[in-house]
Every structure is written in C-alpha cells, then in structure tokens.
C-alpha cells in the first residue's frame, strides 16, 4: 500500500511543478499593447530618425523589446531602444513599422505594428538631376557630377550641399563647374586620423537656387568610389636580362591597400606587356631599400639593348576598400635602354632600292651585249643582191612608165653646117 501512495504523491508534485512552470512562462508570451507617439524626422541631409514611447498598459513582469523593420520587411531589428535611425537617400518614400514584445525571440508574436512614413521633397520627378555620382580623389577631395533633368531650363543654377560626421553643420559646395553635358562640384575631404572615419558616409543633395526642381540625394560610402593619384616612377635598372622597376605610391595610401598594373613597351617588337601586381615589395638587393611608401617589381625577359618604356597605374583593393574598379591615371613614362638610329634606318631604306635598281639595269645591258657576243647575227645573201641591183631596177621601173611605141607627133628639121667650110671661109 505504501508504494501506490508514494506514486500518487510523486505524481501530484509533478503536476504542481508543471502547472507552476506553465503559469510562470505564460505571462511573457502575452501580446503587448502597441507603441505610442511614433514620429519621424530628418537630420542633416539623409539621416532619418524614428522615435516612439513605450506601450501603455504593458505587463509589469515584461522586459520590453521593440521589433522594427522597413516597409519591405528588410533590415529587421530587435532592440530595447525607443528610436531607430538610418542613412538613406530621400528620393523615395520610406516607412518603418514598430511593435513591442517581451523577448528577443523573433518567433514571438509582437504587438500590433505601428507604421510611420516619410516622403521625398515635393517637385516634378522629371526636373530632378540624374546620374548623380561622386568620387573621392586620392582621399583628399571629392568630385561630384550629374546630368540635368528633362524638364529643366538650360540656365538653371545648381547648388550642392554635403555633410559627414566630421562636420558640425551642412556645407555648401562653391566650386561648381561644367564639363560637356555634365555639371559638377568639388570640395575638400581629407582623411582624418579617426580609425572609424572611413566607415562613415558623405550625404549629398543637389537642387537649384530658385527651388524649381526636385532635390536629388545621394549617399557616398567612404570605403567605395576611391580613385588614387598616379604613382611616380623613381628608378629603372637592368640585371641579368631582368628589368627592375621602383616607384613611389600616391600619398595617403599604403602599399597593401593598392593593386598595380605595370606596362612595358619595347621599341623593337612594338608590343606592350602588362603585368598585374598584388604585392610589390622591395626585397631584391638591386632595389633601393628603406624608402618610405615605395614599391618594386621585377619584369623578366627584357631586352637591354633596345628602348623599353614603362608606365604604371594603381587602384584600391578589397582588402581595405569595398570598391576596386576605379583605376588611377597612368604615371609619367620612364624609358631605359637605347633606341636604334632611325635616320640611318630610313637612309638605308632609300638607298638600297636605288642600288638594286641600278644593278638590275646594268645587268640587263650586260646580258644584251653578252647575247650579241655569244649569238652573232647570220649574214643575209639576199641583201647583197638587193644592194647591187637596187638602182638598175629602179631605172627600169622608171622607163616602164613610157610607151616605146609612142610616135612623134611633130618632126623638127635642123640645118647641118660643115665645120671645115666654116674654117675656110674665115681664113
């Protein structure tokens, strides 16, 4: 009898423990009331901030957490703070939904979600500028450019405003310029020693002075759209048919954050070889060592007795930056070696054909004379007879024109005087 009694008592204890545990855990899973006083505001140019108050009538044994996400249910977040901010270009409408719950478990059903939206500035969308983009040049200044909107006047005066966390207030860009169809503006933006500076962004807004066009916004992360200055070639040297190239990196950059392209043009082959370099360390004894911010590369198999021209360009790599597509301009070219005398080469090109043509003419004349000597002309007997009887034949042909039987139509009589009688008479 003792065993059934003990089993019943143990069973009762388990039921009590299970019931107590279930009651204690049911309270946090209760749906809480919605948040109150949800509002939205804009700071600087593109910093949107939502704030709210805790729900009224929330459970006393509930540690409130707030579940929020944007209208497309992206970038979900559960946090105890009663605010949320985001940097976003205000070119489109953006909404935030907020609800309350008692834990960080996403599977827990939050309260009714409260939504608050912010719309972009009013204006004709066709009047807003297009292709607004900015490039951070050599970590020293930023250059932005854009195209005018479709429904804008050609004489529109644009203004660019910018802000980042190192500035106390919004600044206006003064260096407005025009390049072809593009408008643009540049402003100083120097890298600071703050390690988190490059993790920030620059907020950009472009509008007109008269307020007739719709403002356009852009956010430029400082880890992207970075374009270094071209490097500077310091030294070229040959060693064992290898070309050693040493250059100075652009300021504000370290070598491990750059990717290099070395181009070598040879005057003899008239071709260029391109080498992509990730690590350019000056470890060979031919390189000048202990030089700050310099890089080196060895080009194999280069002909030292010809003229070789070298140029280099660089870009950022993904080890330090998010973007690796913007190449710098090419460096100034540097040459090493000797180029063959082009004047002598051209002179030879002109003289050789003349000499060859003269030799061909002389050879032809010589061959003709040699032919006469080897094959003399054969005498023609008929020619001899033609020369002997040629005149007689001509006279015969001449007399053939007259008829030998032609009769004299008139007879003439001449007197004959004896010469002897004339002599006697004279004596």
UniProtKB/Swiss-Prot annotation:
Motif range (Box 1 motif): 374-382
Topology in membrane: Single-pass type I membrane protein
Transmembrane regions: 344-367
UniProt superkingdom: Eukaryota
GO process annotations (BP): cell surface receptor signaling pathway; cytokine-mediated signaling pathway; positive regulation of immunoglobulin production
Tissue: Ubiquitous. Highest levels in heart, liver, skeletal muscle and ovary; lowest levels in brain, lung and kidney. Also found in B-cells, T-cells and endothelial cells.
Database matches in InterPro entries: FN3_dom (IPR003961), FN3_sf (IPR036116), Ig-like_fold (IPR013783), Il13Ra_Ig (IPR040566), Short_hematopoietin_rcpt_2_CS (IPR003532), TypeI_recpt_CBD (IPR015321)
A molecular function GO annotation: cytokine receptor activity
Motif (WSXWS motif): 327-331
Pfam families attached to this UniProt entry: Il13Ra_Ig, IL6Ra-bind
Ranges of residues in domain Fibronectin type-III: 34-123, 128-226, 227-339
Assembly and oligomerization: Interleukin-13 receptor is a complex of IL4R, IL13RA1, and possibly other components. Interacts with TRAF3IP1. Interacts with IL4.
Role played: Binds with low affinity to interleukin-13 (IL13). Together with IL4RA can form a functional receptor for IL13. Also serves as an alternate accessory protein to the common cytokine receptor gamma chain for interleukin-4 (IL4) signaling, but cannot replace the function of IL2RG in allowing enhanced interleukin-2 (IL2) binding activity.
UniProt record similarity statement: Belongs to the type I cytokine receptor family. Type 5 subfamily.
Protein name: Interleukin-13 receptor subunit alpha-1
Organism of derivation: Homo sapiens
